Regions:
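Phosphate-coordination loops involved in phosphoryl transfer and adenosine-cofactor binding
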Residues: 40-46, 151-153, 260
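Rossmann-like adenosine-cofactor binding region
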Residues: 198-278
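Phosphate/diphosphate ligand-binding glycine-rich loop within oxidoreductases
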Residues: 35, 39-144, 271
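Positively charged, low-complexity intrinsically disordered leader regions
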Residues: 1-59, 63, 131, 316
């Protein structure tokens, strides 16, 4: 395996280059096709911090760690009470004495950075309010399965400028995806995010941000949506329903896209809100393939990041008599 990612943190999609993303995806495809990735996590203990609830994230990471020979140890918000009972840095310094790496699903990107600064082993983001890099690896894998490529793939993201949207902007800039973001006025990605994505752009393929879905969908290959109200925004739910209502991914909206366009959603879905049952459960939906790809993408990422870590931290030899 390539050592380019060995021992590295993944806090943002922007931490990766195009070649590194391709290496993860190539290995993920190999794993999905039944290839043996070995046991690069043999003898390693992995601390999983879940400040927020998870379903796909926890299960996919735990299965991936087990398959690679490691041992996952999950800690939940009510146990660690990050920022209340202890600081992120103090928690990290203790976990660093027990575990060989940390996978963290947190509210704050600042806390994630603090943990990474205090832990000697690799730290992987399993989501913050700012970004969702592992989701994007699975998404890019799915796009490649559907379109046969990543560079130049025409992806329409319908939603607000949330963490997934931010990671999509960075990934699109790095990989050359033709990304079109459609949001109601006032819900666009932050200017700082757009500026950073523009700096990451490595070729002529650009991204656009607009309010009208029709021109964006005209030649779309992927129609991607996400919840209108993310965790922590519950007080805004009714207003968001009103503002986003015309952007529901239903059969009427999907008719604006070519017949071959496929639908993606990072889940969980609010059925009947941002997407209808008839679309989510249709032959045009690859949503559950996309969810499955979380396992393969994260398994590949772990195999590359922890490649050689066990050798650098060998098991102690038995004492001689």
């Amino acid at each position: 395996m390539s050592l380019a990612l060995s021992g590295r943190d993944l806090l943002s999609v922007a931490d990766l280059g195009r070649d590194e993303i391709d290496a993860v995806l190539d290995l993920a495809v190999r794993a999905k096709q039944g290839g043996d990735l070995g046991t690069p996590l043999r003898g390693l203990n992995m601390a999983l911090i879940f400040q927020r609830p998870s379903n796909r994230t926890r299960v996919s990471f735990e299965v991936a760690i087990n398959r690679l020979g490691g041992h996952p140890i999950a800690l939940f918000g009510d146990e660690i009470r990050l920022g209340e009972r202890e600081t992120a840095s103090d928690i990290a310094r203790i976990l660093d004495r027990y575990a060989d790496g940390v996978i963290a699903r947190l509210v704050s990107q600042r806390d994630l950075v603090a943990i990474a600064a205090a832990v000697r082993g690799p730290v992987i983001s399993a989501m913050t309010d700012a970004e969702h890099p592992c989701q994007l690896l699975a998404d890019l894998m799915t796009v490649r399965e559907v379109t046969g490529r990543i560079a130049g793939a025409r992806v329409v993201y319908i939603g607000d400028g949330n963490n997934v949207c931010t990671s999509w902007l960075y990934a699109a800039a790095i990989c050359g995806v033709d990304l079109r973001i459609v949001s109601p006025p006032g819900y666009e990605p932050q200017e700082s995010v757009l500026d950073r994505a523009a700096r990451l752009r490595s070729n002529g393929t650009g991204f656009s941000v607009g309010h009208d879905p029709a021109p964006a969908l005209r030649d779309a290959e992927i129609v991607y949506t996400d919840v209108w109200t993310s965790m922590g925004q519950e007080a805004e739910q009714q207003r968001r329903r009103e503002d986003f209502g015309h952007l529901q991914v239903n059969e009427r909206l999907l008719a604006l896209a070519p017949p071959g366009a496929r639908v993606m959603h990072c889940l969980p879905a609010h059925r009947g809100e941002e997407i209808t049952d008839s679309v989510l459960d249709s032959a045009r939906s690859v949503v559950f393939d996309q969810a499955e790809n979380r396992l393969w993408a994260q398994m590949a990422l772990l195999a590359l990041v922890f490649d050689g870590v066990a050798e650098r931290n060998p098991l102690p030899l038995e004492a001689s008599s």
